[in-house]
Amino acid sequence: MLTLIDGNSLLFRAYYGVHSRLTRSDGTPTGAVYGFFNMILPILASANPDDKFVCIFDASRITFRQDIYPQYKMNRSETPADLITQGQMIQSGLMAIGMPVLCVPGVEADDVIATLATKNCTNTNATRIITSDKDLMQLVSDCVYLYDGMKSREIREAQVLEKFGVRPDQVIDVQSLMGDSSDNVPGVPGIGPKKAAELINQFGTLDNLYANLADVKNERIRGLLRDNREMAYISKQLVTLKTDVDLSDLNLAPFVFNTPSALEFIRTNVESNSLATKIEKLFPAEQFSAPAPEFTFPGNACEVPDIPPTPTPQPRREIKCTLITTIDELQNYLTKIDRFLAIDTETTGLNQISDKIVGISLAVNDIDGAYIPIRHRIKSNDLFGSDTTAPNQLTLETVYTYLWPILTNPNILKIGHNLKYDLHIMANEGWDTTKISPIDDTMLLSYILHGALHGHGLDELALKYLGHENIKFSSLFPPKTRDADMHFDQLEIKNAAPYAIEDACICYALYNMMRPELDSDDKLRHLYETCDLPLMPILMQIERNGVLADRNKLNQLSTIFHEQMQKLSDEIWQLSGHEFNIASPKQLGVILFDEMQLPANKKRSTDADSLNELIDTHPIVEKILNWRSIAKLAGTYADALPRQIASDGRIHTTYLQTSTNTGRLSSRDPNLQNIPIKTTLGEEIRKCFIAPPEHTLISVDYSQIQLRLLADIANIKTFRETFISGADIHEQTARKIFNIPTDQPVPREMRRAAKTVNFSIIYGISSFGLASQLGVSRAQAKQIIDSYMAGLPEIGKYIENTKKFATEHACVYTPWGRRIELPEIKNPRLRAYAIRAAINAPIQGFEADLMRRAMVEIANNIIKPNPDKIRMIMQVHDEMVFECRTEYATEFAQKIKSAMENIAQLSVPLVAEYVIAPIWGK
């Protein structure tokens, strides 16, 4: 029998289980490790000698499903640092006992499980999947069953029917309708599990349901299905597990438990006598001492680093907690402040534009904190009653009276963690946060010091720097409380205070450790103080400004997109000969490769790259690609953006300052960075962002910024001369590649080829990739690249020097000193990817540095003196967007252009271009 262990399912169950608080003697959390092995040991002990086992984990959060639906799983919070650490320990422990561990990039662990189970499903082979994940119930068949070890329960067809109300082969269609809030699968709004099962039982399949939509008697349900057809089929793509993951090189041998190695791991790294005793009892060393068969898989992306070294044992940090409920207590605590004050707000929710203060925590050092309760309430037990205000609290007005002089005192540094959020909350209360100064932020300090080496959440940093495990927010509430029901203002003050105070004290302690590290590097400190730190309050103001959105235009666009999708669907169905689900890769593969006999690659893939290779073989391919493009824009923007318009008619995105490796900003709710720039449909989306009456929008961006920075960083003489002279860089490149004399014009197709190479070479494009983009043979593409590199030898030198430095140091630097970490370069399986990233990283990072500093300069010198005339409302890639009174637009556009062009003195000129229009776009 083949047993597939769903590593993620067991890891999360163990992490949140009864042993979750266990630690080693040095304080390292081990509860999840203990729980994981405690669950699997009895299963392994019952195995037959010829049974095979493999444990599968996710390689990363990002998979092909985000290409289908970018919001997929984006509702999930940051993975706790101690969960990541324990996950790594578990993988090491599995290898120690002889268990193969498998991770495949680009897909989820569930897809790997589905592929292995399907391939193993023959008349003689049974597959058992150890999991508690309902998403795997679609795999249940005569030869595949699930096993929940915690409940000692097999899950076969009867149990699936009990759970979903349908057969296993119908589970996918039920999930397509009901969606899944935990994974952000949209489904059909208004249709829950019961109604979904009822519909699928009535019509058999999702396809048959939509083919007979008129037979749905309930008018409301029929309308929901009709209006959300595309979402249903997109959801089906998301919930359908792949069964064709390439595992051709995978070989599994019968499982052999290695007792000596297992005991060494448990005793050294988990320090659990009970687990060691259980292993000795179940797997006596005299019977289980043979080394396990070697397991290798070329595509394996499981990174199993060394177990974290044991730090010097430290006692748990003891924090003095002062609860402030009177003016005298507040005044007494504020007298303790010397030169530094850490501050944190507790709020009514997580909406930074509208939520209010519940309480404020302060810390005058790393072990002396205070909590000021302000708006705690007592929840009414009466369904129709209202909550009452908790006693013994200060009013916000009183707190403001005494705290505001401290916040605005130029001699006291105010320290926060993700301080931008706290400033938003204070602004919601009417506080003028522009006067809060000086400030610093431990999240930004962590980011500039260590970039992508680790996350920058407070809990993770506390564990990393201080060996301290913060109180978990969820632990303040009764077990099994839903996230939506966790309201801080309903907590008893005595329980809320230690949690709030700990955040402020830990922030203070982190500042004491990280700021000296930054101050030891003059170049990095200068970058931080002129770019990263001053940018934070500017981003806060951009978020508060928001951008006006045309709801009617978005709704019209949604209608147009869905009409275009229907028209394309009809054309695609006509070309194929019958209707099918265009959103289904499986059905699409059957249509293209079986029925229409189009050439298929080894994996019979229907992803965008594969279809682009087939675009000249049949007109249906281009129509399918167009349908997908429109479907993505409809689902992500035209349908979604109206729901994100606030009461002021504006969309208030959130800018993330610490989420990319290169220093680029990103955004969420919505993600403005993903709106296509150079497509007609993307332009239509941008037109929905508008100026209010008597105002216009100014959009300013850098021209050919990455090529100009490449010319400067790599010291490319030809590029520098071209940019200084103002000549056409792509035309000049074409002359070099194709040896075109200066007295002859450059043919359009040759300039296009040169432009493609110019913008692709710094991304490490191959001859195969260039051939695909240019529509030429690989031999021709190779000749173009060779000619390009020969004509511009400085680029080859830059690439080789960067590769060498990145390989030796696992990082690269921008000219202004930002360190871009490349930890993947140490992993042989990911090294090629990391090296390609290293080539472009200094350029992309320097572009981010320039943009950050330009935003600071423009905000301070142009926006701040003219708040009634102009304000910044968006930043997207190398573009800034402003809202300006119409009569001043040209004046300010020219000032902004000048500021951007003069932000740095390089060996080539920086050029900025602007557009003035009532809409975002041309």
Q: Where would I find each of the regions flagged by the language model?
A:
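Noncatalytic, basic helical substrate-engagement surface that gates or grips nucleic-acid strands
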Residues: M1-I130, K134-R156, M231-I234, T240-S248, ...
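Conserved RNase H-like, two-metal-ion catalytic cores of nucleic-acid enzymes
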Residues: T3, G7, R13-A47, V54, ...
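Short alpha-helix plus adjacent loop in nuclease-associated cores
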Residues: Q71-T85, S141-V166, R222, Y371-L394, ...
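Accessory alpha-helical DNA-binding modules that contact the DNA backbone or grooves
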Residues: Y145, R167-Q170, L177-Q237, L247, ...
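Conserved "right-hand" nucleotidyltransferase catalytic core of DNA-directed polymerases
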Residues: N228-A390, S437, L453, Y465, ...
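C-terminal structured "cap/appendage" subdomains that terminate the fold
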Residues: L252-P254, I858-Y914
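Conserved catalytic core of nucleic-acid polymerases
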Residues: M486-D489, R544, D648, H652-T653, ...
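Active-site palm subdomain of RNA-directed nucleic acid polymerases
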Residues: L518-C531, L535, L850, A854-V876, ...
